[in-house]
A protein has these predicted regions:
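N- or domain-start disorder-to-order transition segments that initiate the globular core
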Residues: 357-385
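M16 family metallopeptidases and their MPP-like homologs
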Residues: 1, 13-41, 63-69, 119-140, ...
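Edge strands and adjacent loops of beta-rich recognition modules
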Residues: 342-363
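Flexible, low-complexity linker/tail segments at the boundary of structured domains
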Residues: 59, 542-543
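Long, His/Glu/Asp-enriched segments that create or flank divalent metal/ion-associated functional microenvironments
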Residues: 145, 149-153
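Extracytoplasmic/secreted cell-surface and envelope-processing proteins
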Residues: 74-78, 134, 312-315, 425
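An aromatic/glycine/proline-enriched structural segment found at the starts
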Residues: 65-121, 230, 234-239, 323-343, ...
């Protein structure tokens, strides 16, 4: 069983992780010797007694916890647990549990691994620092640190998203956060992650490093922080409002994290109260003091790269990569300028329609017919105190178009939204919607077109505006489409190196009789997509709301 698990996991990422471990954990550090599943040589050849010895050594009462969550009699369950487990004796002179430490490094560590099945470049930049000890996690300072990590990650994501939207994006995707160092819990790291194609490796990794240094040198702006703070408070408020519906699995995972890592479990009521008190009191200057302490360039720098092994592609050597990063460090990196629009989502509201008729259903919902002909189905529920779900659909879809347009048709759902809505790009839209819990997406399927989304009672008006704009204000942005194209090219360039690509292509071809609408997008097709025609098709499908049915359920009267 273990061998099969090891075999099924052994993809390009696993093989490269095994190559990287001795480099990112040098000098024989125990982390360098194996991944948690172990070495296949040991798995296939260990004596049975070794397994029993390991069990006796580590599976003992002082090392174990019992978490039980569900609908039961607490007193009775406690008695059963005590009666079953209290008789297990603690061993005499038990083995001491130890935590493997990760030493600092003065010179940069560069670790590069290649694999022929790797489809894209995936690189990590770590700036190691001391982590917060488990025994200090019960303090208020630790909660403040968790809050700071959250908002820093959100603000960094916004900056990187802007770069990813450029016509010639420096990477396919990227993130910056403060987290554990690689696979170890005993060391923290200010971490940057990026995905690119092999040709764009140099640009991608230097851009990521530059943005990390921009944060460390200049911090964040007040407007960035206000958005991130609003998003955090909205997230906490939503969890608080839904506290009566918290699942047993959520409680269980929270208790397990407490047992294993001493993560605090104050409960959502306490956490909500803390966030309402602390977030308004923590200024952007405090956040910047925190973030500027996370990394330094004179030591503890580690770069780990997982690279496609492609014939003819030359990556920089370890020395060349260090020189590239040193050149970025020498740059005069300017502070980030946050471009924020004060324009409202909709500058003018449309003229109100009216309800022509309504009808109650025996199934508990109400059907409304609007003056424009659209149907609205509404059912108020109490399953979730802070959620409204929405769907809309209309018959038609891609089936109304000629098969010769298959290429434009099958990317319509993905491409139609890359430009944003109204006067807002996707990045600008995310800034305008900061602090609001609202989502919406539009699709054009084979036999229908539609929308789906969700919101909260307090943000229902924003959802309604987004629905209206999705019909009337689809935004064409040639730069955003070019960015999407370039990212698709980067992702698809080495897709054929993944054995699952050939398997999936063959399966789809057989299941759908080579229907061109069902086949996956190919590298050679990306440049052939007609963006203007895709947007024309999208606008045709959403030209008239009269034949749409809108469904709203949840906490909505």
């Amino acid at each position: 069983v273990i061998t099969e698990e090891w075999r099924s996991r052994r993809d390009a990422s696993q093989r490269m992780y095994e190559q990287l471990l001795p480099k990112v954990y040098p000098d024989g550090n125990p982390y360098s010797k194996r991944l948690p599943i172990g070495l296949i040589e040991t798995i296939q050849n260990f004596p049975y007694q070794a397994l029993r010895d390991y069990y006796e050594k580590w599976y003992r009462p002082d090392q174990q916890g019992i978490v039980v969550v569900g609908d039961f009699d607490v007193d009775e369950m406690e008695k059963k647990i005590i009666s079953i487990f209290s008789t297990i004796a603690k061993p005499v002179n038990p083995a001491e549990r130890f935590y493997v430490q990760v030493p600092d490094n003065k010179e940069p560590i560069i670790a590069m691994a290649k694999d022929k099945e790797q489809q894209y470049v995936q690189s990590y930049i770590f700036m190691k620092h001391e982590d917060i000890p488990d025994e200090m996690k019960s303090s208020l300072n630790y909660y403040i640190t968790l809050y700071a990590k959250q908002v820093v990650g959100r603000m960094a994501a916004q900056r990187l998203a802007e770069l990813a939207e450029l016509p010639e994006p420096p990477f396919i995707d990227a993130a910056i956060m403060d987290d554990d160092y690689f696979i170890s819990k005993t060391k923290g790291a200010f971490t940057g992650i990026m995905i690119s194609n092999e040709a764009g490796f140099n640009t991608a990794i230097t851009t990521l490093y530059r943005e990390m240094l921009r944060i460390l040198r200049h911090g964040f702006t007040a407007s960035e922080y206000e958005r991130a703070k609003a998003e955090f408070l909205t997230m906490i408020e939503s969890a608080y409002n839904q506290r009566a519906k918290t699942t047993s699995a959520s409680y269980c995972s929270e208790y397990v994290r407490h047992f294993i890592d001493n993560e605090p479990i104050p409960g959502i009521e306490t956490e909500y109260a803390l966030s309402q008190q602390l977030a308004p009191a923590i200024t952007v200057d405090i956040i910047n003091q925190y973030v500027m302490s996370l990394g330094q360039t004179d030591s503890n720098l580690v770069v780990a790269c997982m690279l496609p092994d492609v014939e003819g592609v030359q990556y920089p050597t370890e020395q060349e990569l260090v020189a590239m990063l040193k050149a970025v460090e020498a740059e005069n990196i300017e502070p980030y300028v946050d471009k924020v629009s004060n324009e409202p989502l909709m500058s003018e509201l449309p003229e109100k329609g009216s309800i022509k008729k309504s009808k109650e259903s025996v199934l508990g919902y109400t059907e409304y017919t609007l003056s424009n002909g659209a149907k609205v189905y509404h059912k108020e529920t109490d399953f979730n105190a802070d959620q409204i779900l929405f769907r809309a659909y209309s018959k038609g879809g891609l089936s109304l178009y000629d098969e010769a347009e298959a290429l434009n048709l099958k990317v319509a759902s993905e491409v139609m939204g890359v430009g944003g809505l109204g006067n807002f790009s996707t990045t600008d839209l995310s800034k305008v919607l900061a602090g609001k819990k609202v989502s919406i997406s539009s699709t054009v399927n084979t036999f229908s077109e539609g929308m789906s989304g969700s919101t909260t009672p307090k943000d229902i008006e924003t959802l309604m505006q987004l629905i209206y704009m999705s019909f009337t204000a689809m935004r064409t942005d040639d730069d955003a489409f070019k960015s999407w194209q370039n990212k698709q090219i980067a992702l698809l360039k080495n897709a054929a190196t993944d054995p699952m690509t050939a398997f999936n292509d063959t399966l789809v071809a057989k299941l759908y009789s080579n229907n061109p609408l069902a086949t996956q997008l190919k590298l050679e097709d990306v440049e052939k997509i007609d963006y203007a025609r895709v947007m024309e098709i999208a606008r045709e499908r959403y030209a008239n709301a009269a034949d749409f049915s809108f469904i709203f359920t949840g906490k909505i009267s």
